[in-house]
A protein has these predicted regions:
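Rossmann-like dinucleotide/flavin-binding elements
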Residues: 17-49, 91-105, 113-122, 137-186
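Ferredoxin-type iron-sulfur electron-transfer modules and their immediate structural context
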Residues: 1-24, 58-77, 111-128
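N-terminal Rossmann-like dinucleotide/flavin-binding domain of flavoprotein oxidoreductases
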Residues: 58-106
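Residues in the short beta-alpha loop(s) of Rossmann-like NAD(P)-binding domains
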Residues: 52
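A short helix-to-beta-strand connector/capping loop
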Residues: 82-90, 128-133, 180
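Short glycine/proline-centered loop/turn elements that form peptide/ligand docking sites
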Residues: 55
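Flexible, Lys/Arg-rich cytosolic regulatory linkers and terminal tails that connect or flank
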Residues: 1-5, 131, 138, 149-150
C-alpha cells in the first residue's frame, strides 16, 4: 500500500514517463490510491474506478473500531495528495467492467480491488455466518455501527476468534476490555 520509495523521500517524482501512458486503477482503497497517485506523479494519465461512494477502502472501514480511529488519517492524506494531481481522474460509484476499462485505452491496469475475509473450511461455519451466529470482521464492524454491541453486550460472553493475525487481535482488543472471555484459534 505504501510507496516503497518513501525511504528515499520523493526521489521517484523526479522520474517521468518518456511517452504518453494511460493507467486504469480499479479500486480506491489505500493501495489503489497510492498506485494512482504515484503513476500520476510520474506523468501518467490515471483513471481510478471505485464502486463505492467514497475512497479509502478497508482502512476507512476498520477505522470504525474505537482503537483504530487514526486509520482514517492515511486515506485522507492520499485523497489530499490525489486532489492536487490534474492528470488523476477519480470515478466514484463506478463498478469497473472490461468494456469500461477498455474505453480508457490503458497501457497498464492495476487491480486494487481489496480482499474478503477468509472463511476457513470448518464444517458448519458458513451456515452459522448466514444465520448470524458467527461474524466476519465486516459483520462485526457493521453491527458495531448499527449499535448492536452496547458496552454491556460483551460482559460474560464467550468470544472465539479464528485467526491470530492483526485482524483477529483487533477483534480481541474490542471484546476483552468489555468483559468477554476471549479465545483465539490460529
Amino acid at each position: 500500500t505504501v510507496n516503497p520509495a518513501v525511504p528515499e523521500g520523493d526521489i521517484y517524482k523526479n522520474m517521468k514517463v518518456k511517452k504518453s501512458c494511460n493507467v486504469v486503477v480499479v479500486g480506491g482503497g489505500t493501495a489503489g490510491l497510492e498506485a494512482a497517485c504515484t503513476a500520476a506523479e510520474v506523468g501518467c494519465n490515471v483513471f481510478l474506478l471505485e464502486k463505492k461512494n467514497h475512497l479509502g477502502g478497508l482502512s476507512t472501514f476498520i477505522s470504525d473500531l474505537p482503537s483504530k480511529t487514526r486509520m482514517k488519517d492515511f486515506p485522507k492524506y492520499l485523497e489530499a495528495r490525489a486532489s492536487r494531481l490534474h492528470n488523476l481522474y477519480i470515478f466514484l460509484n463506478t463498478e469497473a467492467t472490461v468494456e469500461m476499462v477498455k474505453r480508457f485505452k490503458p497501457d497498464i491496469v492495476v487491480n486494487a480491488t481489496g480482499s474478503v475475509p477468509l472463511v476457513p473450511p470448518i464444517p458448519g461455519l458458513k451456515e452459522n455466518i448466514a444465520e448470524g451466529n458467527v461474524a466476519t470482521i465486516f459483520d462485526m464492524i457493521n453491527n458495531l455501527n448499527a449499535g448492536k454491541y452496547p458496552d454491556d453486550f460483551c460482559k460474560g460472553k464467550e468470544v472465539v476468534v479464528v485467526g491470530g493475525g492483526s485482524v483477529g487481535l483487533d477483534v480481541i482488543e474490542y471484546f476483552a476490555p468489555r468483559g468477554a472471555k476471549c479465545t483465539i484459534i490460529d
